[in-house]
């Protein structure tokens, strides 16, 4: 899920944390208001389902955003890392979040999985900040992506990939 609430991307409403897995499975997650059935009815995949699929797609590298910047879900980092390791995908995953402390925790728990900061506002010395926190990716909002960020990140051997808002 992209948002804390299911309203925008599904035919349901309410906060994800208020819904059971069974209730989430009943929702159509095809952006009904935006795409009006263009892709048919889609069910929300679990992380496990996604990782199972990804394990078969050998050339795929993916970014998984931990959705814990508005509401923190204790233990999420460990559970996600355990599942990634279960499928042997450590070298094909980038874990990112707007909650930088969460990504630092991920990197402390498993240094083999790349980490990235999602950033919505201007950050001085972005490369130094990210490198100090031991992440490999810096994902700024395009509005705040400046030449100095790219230079700072390059000098600190970081990958810069702009944040895409859907």
Provide a role label for each language-model segment.
Residues 140-141, 162-163:
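Thr-Gly-centered strand-to-loop micro-motif
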Residues 166:
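Catalytic cores of alpha/beta
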């Amino acid at each position: 899920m992209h948002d804390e609430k299911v309203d925008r991307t599904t035919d349901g409403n309410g906060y994800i944390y208020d819904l059971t897995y069974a209730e989430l499975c009943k929702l159509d997650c095809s952006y009904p208001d935006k795409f009006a059935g263009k892709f048919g009815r889609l069910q929300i995949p679990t992380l496990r389902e996604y990782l199972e699929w990804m394990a078969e797609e050998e050339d795929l590298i993916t970014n998984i955003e931990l959705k814990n910047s508005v509401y923190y879900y204790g233990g999420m980092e460990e559970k996600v890392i355990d599942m990634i390791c279960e499928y042997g995908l450590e070298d094909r995953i980038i874990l990112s979040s707007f909650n930088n402390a969460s990504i630092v925790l991920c990197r402390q728990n498993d240094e083999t999985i790349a980490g990235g900061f999602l950033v919505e506002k201007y950050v001085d010395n972005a490369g130094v900040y990210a490198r100090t926190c031991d992440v490999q990716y810096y994902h700024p909002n395009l509005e705040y992506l400046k030449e100095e960020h790219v230079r700072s990140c390059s000098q600190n051997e970081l990958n810069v990939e702009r944040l895409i808002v859907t």
